[in-house]
Curated annotation (Swiss-Prot):
Signal peptide region: 1-30
Record's protein name: Interleukin-32
Any GO molecular function: cytokine activity
Alphabetized UniProt keyword annotations: Cytokine, Secreted, Signal
Gene encoding the protein: IL32
Amino acid sequence: MCFPKVLSDDMKKLKARMVMLLPTSAQGLGAWVSACDTEDTVGHLGPWRDKDPALWCQLCLSSQHQAIERFYDKMQNAESGRGQVMSSLAELEDDFKEGYLETVAAYYEEQHPELTPLLEKERDGLRCRGNRSPVPDVEDPATEEPGESFCDKVMRWFQAMLQRLQTWWHGVLAWVKEKVVALVHAVQALWKQFQSFCCSLSELFMSSFQSYGAPRGDKEELTPQKCSEPQSSK
């Protein structure tokens, strides 16, 4: 199946229609992401959403508009068969995903530097989760509409791509949240071990002083909880 070369004006209208489907604000992006589930989907981003919505928009949305521009240029420069259109849409989908991944990494690296090693280690895994499924070679006849124009057909495919992207983004956010929570728990466990070590070291010093005849007195036994409490001056 080969589509005829489309007039420039038609392509401009197509690009405008595609851009209109994208969120245009931080609030709109949050609604777009959470539409496939509940508003808690992006809740773990916490103060980021309220701190600088303009930055969120710039990072997440500008890359999408740039990707649509590249797609528009490809479609305008040559006659497009269905395979080429679907391949270009697949590249567009990957570009969208890459933009989202870069935004997540930029946020956590800035707001939580301690997460940088985790992100560097897990980033490849994050991208693997985002790998798109192969684009089908044959479209389901039930989805075809008689007399459908090239632009209408591309718009229908683009809308289907956005639905897949929405579901994928929901999964990515859940995955990142899971990793962050796991890291916080690991840090808390290490901190408890450090407190226990400090208490054991204190007990060792006290025992050493006792062996030289220093009276222990009626001091209570140290515990990790006691070590973590602020000591009052006497």
